[in-house]
């Protein structure tokens, strides 16, 4: 019996290229999975793109910001400072939340801090959805940072869709709207006009659906045609 193995971000991207009826609706998709870490999946021409060594799509380790005023700084441990994962993964939102808790003493985040509880990304999302202004601002900054990465993806692949999944998708439009706005501000004129930037549609089921679709794609090579 044939067995096919791939990583979770790749199969999630494959699922997101398909609708709820599992029909292929987007042939070129870039997916960001934003949670404890930042992963990425690429679907090009209706099939997972893996690259020369099978490791394509490590979008979390692309560099968003680096001090290049002088010599290029020596690399540090992964995630590298300035990488997408360093500034967008859950621990980055944890840092923003801790700062907000200190700066805004009347916020829900400050109450967590006053109770001696760690202020985590899940608390930020929950507080933002409940209308806490400082938490909503942290989610907005989070979305803006993701938007820069989305702009890079649009410049590189000119995809039909860029999808944001993982825990970040729980923030909904509070995250998506700033991500979309910044992405479109940072792309060249004309680029992105046909790119849909959206949240993942399949949620926690994306991995399972994508795994099933992977088997179908491998067993039926013309399925994406």
Segments from the language model and where they lie:
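Active-site neighborhood for divalent-cation/phosphate handling
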Residues: 1-22
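Short glycine-aspartate micro-motif
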Residues: 4, 29-33, 39-41
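Active-site glycine-centered loops adjacent to acidic/histidine catalytic or metal-binding residues
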Residues: 8, 35, 211
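Adenylate-forming
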Residues: 11-18, 40-42, 61-63
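ATP-binding/phosphotransfer module of carbohydrate and carboxylate kinases, centering on a glycine-rich
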Residues: 15-30, 66-225
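A short, polar/charged loop-to-alpha-helix boundary motif
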Residues: 55-70
């Amino acid at each position: 019996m044939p067995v096919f193995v791939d990583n979770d971000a790749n199969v999630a991207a494959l699922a997101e290229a398909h609708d709820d009826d599992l029909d292929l609706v987007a042939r070129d998709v870039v997916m960001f999975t934003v949670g404890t870490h930042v992963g990425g999946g690429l679907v090009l021409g209706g099939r997972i793109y893996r690259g020369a060594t099978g490791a394509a799509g490590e979008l979390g380790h692309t560099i968003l910001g680096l001090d290049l005023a002088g010599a290029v700084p020596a690399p540090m441990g992964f995630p590298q400072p300035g990488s997408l994962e360093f500034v967008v993964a859950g621990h980055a939102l944890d840092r923003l939340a801790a700062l907000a808790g200190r700066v805004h003493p009347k916020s829900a985040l400050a109450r967590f801090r006053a109770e001696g509880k760690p202020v985590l990304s899940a608390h930020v999302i929950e507080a933002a959805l409940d209308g806490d202004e400082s938490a909503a601002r942290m989610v907005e900054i989070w979305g803006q940072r993701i938007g820069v990465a989305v702009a890079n993806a649009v410049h590189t692949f000119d995809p039909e869709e860029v999808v944001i999944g993982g825990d970040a998708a729980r923030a909904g439009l509070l995250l998506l709207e700033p991500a979309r706005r910044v992405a479109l501000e940072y792309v060249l004129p004309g680029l992105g006009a046909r790119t849909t930037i959206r949240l993942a549609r399949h949620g926690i089921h994306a991995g399972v659906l994508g795994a099933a679709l992977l088997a179908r794609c491998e067993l039926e090579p013309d399925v994406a045609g």
